[in-house]
Every structure is written in C-alpha cells, then in structure tokens.
C-alpha cells in the first residue's frame, strides 16, 4: 500500500523529507500568493438591461400639447372649509357657477372630498362623564379646480365672488356640541406647476365655443 506522501507526490504536491524546523519548510512549501496576472478573464462585461419605465413606454407618448384627447393645466385652486354644514351644497354651487360664468375657459373640477373626526369624538364621549365638555369634531371639505395660468386671475376672482355671495343658512351646527355658529369661512389656496398636468377631455369642462 502506497503511503500518503507518495500519493500526494503523484498528484503534484511538493513532498520532501523534513530534517530541519518544520515551520521553515512549511513556509518554503507554501504556494505563491495569486497575483493580478494569475487570474485573467477574456469575457467582456455585459451592460445591465434596465427596463424603460418612462411615461412614454407605459402609456405611450406623453402629450406635449393640446390634442384630441388631453388638455394641459398648470394652475390649481383648492377650496377648503372646516365645519361647513352644507359642504356638498356649497361645492355644487361653486361648480355650477364656474360652469356658467367661465364658459369661455376650459377648466376641471374634482368631486368634493370630506373628512371628519366624528367617530373618534363619539368614542371619547362614551368614556367621559356628561358633565365634562366634549372635544368638538372637525368636518372638512376639499374641492380642486384646475385651469391655465393665463386664466388664473378670472378663476380666482370668480371663486371669491361665488363664495362671498352664498346665502347664509338659518344656522350652522357642529355635530358634537349642537350649538349654533356664524357662517363658516371658506379658504382658497392657489398652486402653480412647473410642468403642465394633462387630463383626459372626459374629465374636463370644455370651453363653450359660443362664449369665446
């Protein structure tokens, strides 16, 4: 039976008889460390293929101007109010007024978004004695009007006019405390965009050709 050293020598391992300190011979037999020239590659790096996630690739060419399907807007007004009892009626009135008085302009109006903290107020009321004052809830409405910057002044003036001309209700009531309050203020915020935002014409109030 061949010895292990003979087998290793047959495999190409450097084998010799150790007569001196073992550490010195082990250091001599240690294979050289790989250098930059001992490991080479002939394959060329393959560039990463990043999918095109641009608007053009997902939804086709982005509209760069007025066309048959899209309208561009760069100005937005937000109509906001807190604790407005007739919030739906108020925004419906604004929307109808803008449609009539601004018939020569192309605009877009969103539906009214309403937020309320009444549910949390009711939970607090169940855990509080009736003698303690309950924190009143806040109801908020938000409606957005989009237009072009060239028409922003007319839109702004008309929004202020229709809000100031609203008929005050007999009373305004907060749902949590039941007390009456004066007319609730309505706020108008104006935003301008650097790039136009395009909406489909199905969601736009088109300008009346006869009013132009």
UniProtKB/Swiss-Prot annotation:
Pfam families linked: Herpes_UL3 (PF03369)
InterPro entries from the UniProt entry: Herpes_UL3
Domain of life: Viruses
Keyword line: Host nucleus, Phosphoprotein
Compartments where located: Host nucleus
CC terms in the record's Gene Ontology section: host cell nucleus
Post-translational modification: Phosphorylated.
Family: Belongs to the alphaherpesvirinae HHV-1 UL3 family.
Name listed for the protein in its UniProt record: Nuclear phosphoprotein UL3 homolog
